[in-house]
């Protein structure tokens, strides 16, 4: 009995070690977004609350927590309240299979890719439930857009994943990282470049980020699926969006960019200099790079029209992935060096 309780406590501690830094990262990702986009638009960004505005995320959190939670009169109150949790929980539980370094993973399962793909797709249920439960036309339009968008881009994302599975020969995330050993030229983003780009575009669409943020298009449907949400409900949707961004960026780093592996592996004099850098630091740097690209894309591109979004998903990305899957299969059979 005591042994079982000890194991349970240890699992809870490991979960907290992952979740608490993740929530803090989400808070400061909002700060980074406002700063980066501010600099791109030749503004300063938040600079009043704390040194250089560093306490701004906590001020925003305090503001949202203290706001009144308003539940629309004709809404389904039970579903309206739990919908934000349906959106947030998948983006948190996906971290259970993320390897931060060799052997540093909560659950090293053999179907890690499948599990993570499923978790990254489940958040759309929270959006759909929120749109329907709000009993609002704008919210429902936003929810339907988001559902159609997610389903469309999941297909391209799934095909891109198949390419990685063909190349690595495993669905275990640790094995996929280890299959990229040998330096930057051995990482999968080089032979699978079209799949890498498709996966990245689909990841932006999955997380409802600009230029694919049609689910919350301010100029068309006000705030979209969370138009009726205020206070902590809105904060949870906000949290789930940014947590999903970090999860997709981590997924990209592991599948295509060597995870925790050093880019200088195989370059003797550089490898000796950077040998002391822990693996998880390289992983964090790669995640930060993808997050920066998220913000850069948001500040650069205008929002797509709905028909353009669907056309890109069905008529461009899916055919590209199918063609490159055939090419990847041929490269695997031909044992093209240095990857296969």
Curated annotation (Swiss-Prot):
Pfam families: NADHdh. GO terms for molecular function: NADH dehydrogenase activity; oxidoreductase activity, acting on NAD(P)H, quinone or similar compound as acceptor; quinone binding. InterPro entries: NADH_UbQ_OxRdtase_su1/FPO, NADH_UbQ_OxRdtase_su1_CS. It is a multi-pass membrane protein. It catalyses: a quinone + NADH + 5 H(+)(in) = a quinol + NAD(+) + 4 H(+)(out). It comes from the Bacteria. GO terms for cellular component: plasma membrane. The chain crosses the membrane at residues 4-24, 78-98, 113-133, 151-171, 184-204, 244-264, 273-293, 316-336. One of its GO terms (biological process) is aerobic respiration. Its EC number is 7.1.1.-. PROSITE patterns: COMPLEX1_ND1_2. NDH-1 is composed of 14 different subunits. Subunits NuoA, H, J, K, L, M, N constitute the membrane sector of the complex. NDH-1 shuttles electrons from NADH, via FMN and iron-sulfur (Fe-S) centers, to quinones in the respiratory chain. The immediate electron acceptor for the enzyme in this species is believed to be ubiquinone. Couples the redox reaction to proton translocation (for every two electrons transferred, four hydrogen ions are translocated across the cytoplasmic membrane), and thus conserves the redox energy in a proton gradient. This subunit may bind ubiquinone. This is NADH-quinone oxidoreductase subunit H. It comes from Legionella pneumophila (strain Corby).
